[in-house]
């Protein structure tokens, strides 16, 4: 299907940054509306020809602070909502209440009625390369849910609740670099 290319959708975005009087901190607010095509696996089926572009609105409030000349701390709250997402109809026999952006399986009779919401808090400490060291430590606590075709709120497939990442490295000379990466996250929701 190429008819998605014939539509114009307005996607406004807004970004404001306020530098605090201490000279090393800032508050940042971002908001925006985004569109994306439904997955091609659904668009390829004629019965799904009425699907719309998935609509997303997201916004965040962020506090940023320079701890040193090469180290920055960021703390953010964010929220993202989806609408018009692909969803199975409750009228179809033997359908499970699945948020179809999470699982790509071949279905016909898909509707643009899905909705989802994600809220989270993220902490990030970044150390830019200085004196041959660099790294970052990041942690996120979030909740990602969707409403199924019976309007029951359910966990999305990737709703792990928390994720932590540590990445770091040391470059003793231009030809050598040692790095490490470690990730920890909650289990898949059931």
Where are these regions (language model features)?
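Signature of Gram-negative outer-membrane beta-barrel scaffolds
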Residues: 1-22, 37-38, 42, 151
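Face-selective signature of the C-terminal outer-membrane beta-barrel domain
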Residues: 1-6, 21, 74, 121-122, ...
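Membrane-embedded beta-barrel scaffold of Gram-negative outer-membrane proteins
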Residues: 19, 26-30, 53-113, 117-119
């Amino acid at each position: 299907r190429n008819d998605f290319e014939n539509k114009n959708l307005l996607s406004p975005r807004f970004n404001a940054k306020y530098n605090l009087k201490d000279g090393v901190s800032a508050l940042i607010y971002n908001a925006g509306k985004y569109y994306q095509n439904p997955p091609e696996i659904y668009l390829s089926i004629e019965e799904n020809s009425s699907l719309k572009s998935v609509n997303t609105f997201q916004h965040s409030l962020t506090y940023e602070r320079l701890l040193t000349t090469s180290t920055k701390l960021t703390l953010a709250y964010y929220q993202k909502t989806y609408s018009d997402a692909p969803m199975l109809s409750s009228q179809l026999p033997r359908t499970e209440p699945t948020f179809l952006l999470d699982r790509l399986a071949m279905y016909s009779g898909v509707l643009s009625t899905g909705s989802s919401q994600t809220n989270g808090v993220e902490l990030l400490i970044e150390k830019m390369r200085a004196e041959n060291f660099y790294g970052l430590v990041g942690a996120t606590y979030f909740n990602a849910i969707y409403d199924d075709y019976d309007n029951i709120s359910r966990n999305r497939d990737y709703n792990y609740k928390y994720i932590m990442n540590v990445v770091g490295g040391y470059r003793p000379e231009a030809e050598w670099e040692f790095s490490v990466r470690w990730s920890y996250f909650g289990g898949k929701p059931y």
